């Protein structure tokens, strides 16, 4: 019993534990409701498809969902609890289900089940705007916050998200002007000075991201557009135009200049260069009105400036030449800014500067059928209106006071410098009118001539006419000789006309004038009109027919059956002068044409051919007999001067300027071609000179230079006989002995550059090898003309030893001059051995002795 009694305490403790620990619970479980789990945790946006929890309900009880539960979040089906919504942290971070167990209507047990919702990044940031515009002044200082953070900040519903901002430019180069203060602070600041005229507005795209890195998942971004409008500020002073811009804020102001006449008060505003006084507000967007004034330089208040438009006018005349330097001020109307510049006005004497037209002869055209009021077109450029202007050279202000009128025709009227028709143009014709220019200030008058062609269509432009000397005088003009064409044949007779002023010639009725490329004037200022006729016509009376002057272009197009001649031959024996260099006479032969460039002259006279550079191709048509020099019964024919282009049209004249397209070359084209050819010719000449100098230099050196003097064998007195100079002296008293007088060939070639020729008979013999100091005499067998030597006793000055040797030729008279030449002394022994017959009894022993002394002697040949 003792042993069993000892076993009870250990067994009693587990028994009590079971009885007191489990039995109450088991009894309670059998009496109240319960759930297997009452607290749940899940991420938002998680969907639970099965039951959330299992509920234990006693047999005599039932469970319901209490009213304090989260609405529409749970439901109870049987003994199971379901979550019927997708949890959202931003809407409800904690869901609660209140479960009630009842027995009948009596509440027995109540307990709660909680669902904790965890936040995740499931929401994108949001800006309070989509597009927003802001105005920024142009003069805003750098580093200024132009848009605060509160106006650009985005929001994110996620609790722990930190937004990152990025500014992207939409307008190119806009990012260099603005930037964000920081990646987490969207405040916008100015980084560079604004320029309204370069960037009047800029657009940016603002991004907000809820993750620091872009590639993180999940990541959300919001976008908004920011537009910045730059408002102009008053930063620039007024600018005088035209001005050279250095940047967008400053410019080099224009300075004005003009010339006015003395003694006259000009009624209209002065014409200045480079333009009128005009200033604008440098801030064009603000564009404040400008007020003008003269600050200084207006001596005696001579000038007045309009404060609104800047026009400068004269208040009084200026008696004598002087210069005004006006300082002109341009100020904004709000008086905020101003600028100054100079206007230099020179007063000069107008004497010596007459009113004159730019051309003494104008060519115009009007389409047939034109109504009244039609402007006359320029014949050279039919698409442009013909403008007739007279002016004073160097006085632009006087030109504004010039009025124009037509003096000899009621069919045209001047509208300023434009010529208008007053009646319809119904017939084809050529009309010549006189236009008069009158200066209302100086009362000067100038006239010019306008030749107007009325045709069915505007004639094609051939070559631009070269304007003649600016003409137009007020005095009466002299008679003008005009070469008019004849419709039958090629003879050309002069027609003499006259008109008042320098009006120029008027052609007879029915004459068709060619559209010449130039209208040269004859001496005196009257223009000579070029007419499409033959330039060289036959003159049976023997008179010379003068052809057009240089620069006249006369196309030469023979028609069928016509005989065209550009250079008539003279059967009476006179020579025909052909064109000079530079004359162009193009004539292209066609089938059936008989062309002769140089026909024979019946009387046997020589016909001068064209000089170098003359081009004389001929253009006859089928059946035409063409010769460049046809026969002329008598007299001489003067041909064109250099530079004259004379293709000629013969036969019936049906139109004007009927040249082929290939002949439409302007004066500028010819000048360019001439310049190129001249440059090529110059290069060819330079190359030729270099070649000649390289290959023939030694010949020019030996032929053009003086003969080299042989070195003397002894002492030479340079006082008596200077080098390189010929000394002339009379012959000695002794006459040469008679003898044969054949021509003595020169023993040595004379220098071609020698200024003093030596007689052939007195040429010295070639020097022989030196033996002694005696000169060599000419042998009798060597030359038919005997030459002998006489040694004179005449001594040289002290200190200069030696004698003078005089050589006499027998064929030289006493009246001949003596040429003194420096020659080296010949060998004495050779001279004595030669037995020259030039020596005679006058040679005394002293002279022979002096020869043997080896002294240097002067050889004088007579």
From Swiss-Prot:
<dbReference type="GO" id="GO:0005903">
    <property type="term" value="C:brush border"/>
</dbReference>
<feature type="region of interest" description="Mediates interaction with USH1C and MYO7B and is required for proper localization to microvilli tips and function in microvilli organization">
    <location>
        <begin position="693"/>
        <end position="862"/>
    </location>
</feature>
<feature type="glycosylation site" description="N-linked (GlcNAc...) asparagine">
    <location>
        <position position="479"/>
    </location>
</feature>
<keyword id="KW-0325">Glycoprotein</keyword>
<feature type="transmembrane region" description="Helical">
    <location>
        <begin position="672"/>
        <end position="692"/>
    </location>
</feature>
<dbReference type="GO" id="GO:0031528">
    <property type="term" value="C:microvillus membrane"/>
</dbReference>
<feature type="compositionally biased region" description="Basic and acidic residues">
    <location>
        <begin position="791"/>
        <end position="801"/>
    </location>
</feature>
<feature type="glycosylation site" description="N-linked (GlcNAc...) asparagine">
    <location>
        <position position="438"/>
    </location>
</feature>
<dbReference type="GO" id="GO:0007156">
    <property type="term" value="P:homophilic cell adhesion via plasma membrane adhesion molecules"/>
</dbReference>
<keyword id="KW-1133">Transmembrane helix</keyword>
<keyword id="KW-0732">Signal</keyword>
<feature type="modified residue" description="Phosphoserine">
    <location>
        <position position="834"/>
    </location>
</feature>
<dbReference type="InterPro" id="IPR015919">
    <property type="entry name" value="Cadherin-like_sf"/>
</dbReference>
<feature type="domain" description="Cadherin 2">
    <location>
        <begin position="128"/>
        <end position="240"/>
    </location>
</feature>
<comment type="function">
    <text>Intermicrovillar adhesion molecule that forms, via its extracellular domain, calcium-dependent heterophilic complexes with CDHR2 on adjacent microvilli. Thereby, controls the packing of microvilli at the apical membrane of epithelial cells. Through its cytoplasmic domain, interacts with microvillus cytoplasmic proteins to form the intermicrovillar adhesion complex/IMAC. This complex plays a central role in microvilli and epithelial brush border differentiation.</text>
</comment>
<dbReference type="GO" id="GO:0005902">
    <property type="term" value="C:microvillus"/>
</dbReference>
<feature type="region of interest" description="Disordered">
    <location>
        <begin position="821"/>
        <end position="862"/>
    </location>
</feature>
<keyword id="KW-0812">Transmembrane</keyword>
<protein>
    <recommendedName>
        <fullName>Cadherin-related family member 5</fullName>
    </recommendedName>
</protein>
<dbReference type="GO" id="GO:0016020">
    <property type="term" value="C:membrane"/>
</dbReference>
<feature type="glycosylation site" description="N-linked (GlcNAc...) asparagine">
    <location>
        <position position="311"/>
    </location>
</feature>
<feature type="glycosylation site" description="N-linked (GlcNAc...) asparagine">
    <location>
        <position position="201"/>
    </location>
</feature>
<dbReference type="InterPro" id="IPR020894">
    <property type="entry name" value="Cadherin_CS"/>
</dbReference>
<feature type="modified residue" description="Phosphoserine">
    <location>
        <position position="751"/>
    </location>
</feature>
<feature type="glycosylation site" description="N-linked (GlcNAc...) asparagine">
    <location>
        <position position="408"/>
    </location>
</feature>
<dbReference type="GO" id="GO:0007155">
    <property type="term" value="P:cell adhesion"/>
</dbReference>
<feature type="modified residue" description="Phosphoserine">
    <location>
        <position position="832"/>
    </location>
</feature>
<feature type="modified residue" description="Phosphoserine">
    <location>
        <position position="783"/>
    </location>
</feature>
<comment type="subunit">
    <text>Part of the IMAC/intermicrovillar adhesion complex/intermicrovillar tip-link complex composed of ANKS4B, MYO7B, USH1C, CDHR2 and CDHR5. Interacts (via cytoplasmic domain) with USH1C and MYO7B; required for proper localization of CDHR5 to microvilli tips and its function in brush border differentiation.</text>
</comment>
<feature type="modified residue" description="Phosphothreonine">
    <location>
        <position position="825"/>
    </location>
</feature>
<feature type="repeat" description="1">
    <location>
        <begin position="545"/>
        <end position="575"/>
    </location>
</feature>
<feature type="region of interest" description="Disordered">
    <location>
        <begin position="706"/>
        <end position="803"/>
    </location>
</feature>
<feature type="glycosylation site" description="N-linked (GlcNAc...) asparagine">
    <location>
        <position position="36"/>
    </location>
</feature>
<feature type="glycosylation site" description="N-linked (GlcNAc...) asparagine">
    <location>
        <position position="45"/>
    </location>
</feature>
<keyword id="KW-0966">Cell projection</keyword>
<dbReference type="GO" id="GO:1904970">
    <property type="term" value="P:brush border assembly"/>
</dbReference>
<feature type="glycosylation site" description="N-linked (GlcNAc...) asparagine">
    <location>
        <position position="135"/>
    </location>
</feature>
<dbReference type="GO" id="GO:0030154">
    <property type="term" value="P:cell differentiation"/>
</dbReference>
<feature type="compositionally biased region" description="Pro residues">
    <location>
        <begin position="739"/>
        <end position="768"/>
    </location>
</feature>
<feature type="repeat" description="2">
    <location>
        <begin position="576"/>
        <end position="606"/>
    </location>
</feature>
<dbReference type="GO" id="GO:0031526">
    <property type="term" value="C:brush border membrane"/>
</dbReference>
<feature type="topological domain" description="Cytoplasmic">
    <location>
        <begin position="693"/>
        <end position="862"/>
    </location>
</feature>
């Amino acid at each position: 019993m003792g042993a069993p009694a000892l076993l009870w305490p250990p067994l009693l403790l587990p028994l009590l534990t079971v009885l007191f620990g489990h039995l109450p619970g088991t009894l309670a479980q059998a009496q109240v409701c319960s759930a297997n789990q009452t607290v749940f945790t899940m991420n938002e946006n998680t969907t639970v498809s099965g039951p959330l929890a299992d509920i234990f309900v006693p047999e005599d009880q039932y469970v319901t969902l209490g009213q304090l539960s989260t609405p529409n979040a749970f439901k109870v089906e049987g003994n199971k609890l379901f979550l019927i919504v997708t949890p959202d942290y931003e809407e409800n971070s904690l869901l609660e289900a209140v479960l009630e167990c009842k027995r009948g209507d009596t509440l027995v047990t109540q307990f709660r089940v909680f669902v904790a919702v965890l936040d995740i990044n499931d929401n994108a940031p949001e800006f309070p705007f989509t597009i927003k515009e802001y105005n920024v002044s142009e003069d805003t200082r750098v580093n200024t916050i132009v848009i605060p953070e509160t106006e650009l900040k985005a929001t994110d519903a996620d609790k722990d998200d930190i937004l990152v901002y990025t500014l992207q430019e939409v307008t190119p180069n806009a990012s260099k002007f603005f930037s964000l203060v920081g990646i987490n602070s969207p405040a916008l600041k100015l980084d560079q000075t604004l320029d309204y005229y370069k960037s009047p507005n800029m657009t940016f795209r603002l991004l907000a991201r809820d993750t620091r890195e872009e590639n993180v998942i999940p990541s959300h971004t919001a976008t908004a557009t920011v537009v910045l409008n730059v408002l102009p500020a008053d930063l620039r002073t007024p600018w005088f135009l035209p001005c050279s811009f250095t940047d967008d804020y400053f410019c080099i102001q224009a300075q004005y200049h003009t010339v006015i006449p003395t003694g006259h008060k000009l009624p209209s505003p002065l014409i200045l260069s480079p333009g009128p006084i005009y200033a604008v507000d440098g801030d064009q967007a603000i564009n404040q009105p400008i007020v003008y004034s003269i600050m200084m330089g207006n001596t005696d208040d001579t000038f007045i400036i309009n404060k609104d438009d800047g026009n400068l006018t004269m208040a009084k005349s200026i008696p004598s030449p002087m210069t005004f330097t006006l300082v002109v001020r341009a100020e904004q109307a709000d008086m905020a800014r101003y600028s100054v510049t100079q206007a230099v006005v020179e007063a000069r004497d107008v004497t010596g500067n007459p009113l004159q037209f730019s051309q003494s002869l104008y060519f115009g055209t009007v389409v047939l059928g034109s109504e009244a009021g039609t402007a006359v077109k320029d014949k050279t450029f039919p698409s442009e209106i013909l403008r007739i202007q007279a002016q004073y050279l160097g006085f632009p202000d006087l030109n504004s006071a010039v009025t124009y009128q037509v003096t000899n025709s009621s069919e045209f009227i001047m509208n300023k410098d434009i010529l208008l028709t007053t009646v319809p143009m119904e017939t084809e014709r050529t009309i010549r009118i006189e236009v008069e220019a009158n200066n209302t200030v100086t009362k000067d008058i100038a006239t010019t001539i306008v030749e107007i062609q009325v045709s069915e269509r505007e004639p094609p432009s051939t070559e631009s006419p070269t304007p003649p000397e600016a003409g137009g005088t007020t005095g009466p003009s002299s008679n003008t000789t005009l070469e008019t064409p004849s419709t039958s044949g090629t003879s050309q007779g002069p027609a003499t006309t006259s008109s008042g002023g320098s009006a120029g010639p008027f052609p007879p009725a029915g004459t068709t004038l060619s559209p010449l490329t130039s209208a040269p004037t004859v001496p005196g200022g009257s223009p000579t009109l070029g007419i499409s006729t033959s330039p060289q016509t036959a003159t049976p009376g023997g008179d010379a027919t003068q052809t057009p002057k240089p620069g006249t272009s006369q196309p030469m197009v023979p028609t069928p059956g016509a005989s065209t001649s550009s250079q008539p031959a003279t059967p009476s024996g006179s020579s025909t002068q052909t064109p000079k260099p530079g004359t162009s006479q193009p004539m292209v032969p066609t089938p059936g044409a008989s062309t002769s460039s140089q026909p024979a002259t019946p009387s046997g006279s020589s016909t001068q051919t064209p000089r170098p550079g003359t081009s004389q191709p001929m253009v006859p048509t089928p059946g035409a007999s063409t010769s460049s020099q046809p026969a002329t019964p008598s007299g001489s024919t003067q041909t064109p001067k250099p530079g004259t282009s004379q293709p000629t049209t013969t036969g019936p004249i049906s139109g004007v300027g009927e040249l082929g397209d290939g002949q439409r070359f302007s004066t500028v084209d010819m000048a360019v071609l001439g310049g190129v050819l001249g440059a090529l010719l110059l290069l060819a000449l330079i190359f030729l000179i270099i070649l000649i100098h390289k290959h023939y230099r030694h010949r020019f050196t030996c032929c053009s230079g003086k003969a080299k003097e042989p070195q003397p064998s002894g002492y030479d007195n340079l006082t008596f006989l200077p080098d390189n100079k010929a000394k002339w002296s009379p012959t000695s008293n002794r006459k040469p002995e008679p003898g044969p007088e054949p021509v003595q060939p020169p023993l040595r070639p004379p220098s071609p550059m020698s200024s003093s020729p030596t007689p052939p008979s007195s040429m010295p013999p070639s020097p022989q090898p030196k033996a002694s100091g005696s000169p060599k005499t000419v042998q009798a067998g060597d030359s038919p003309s005997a030459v002998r030597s006489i040694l004179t006793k005449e001594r040289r000055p002290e200190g200069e030893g030696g004698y003078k040797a005089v050589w006499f030729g027998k064929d030289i008279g006493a009246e001949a001059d003596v040429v003194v030449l420096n020659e080296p002394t010949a060998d004495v022994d050779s001279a004595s051995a030669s037995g020259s017959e030039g020596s005679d009894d006058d040679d005394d022993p002293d002279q022979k002795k002096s020869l043997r002394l080896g002294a240097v002697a002067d050889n004088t040949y007579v």
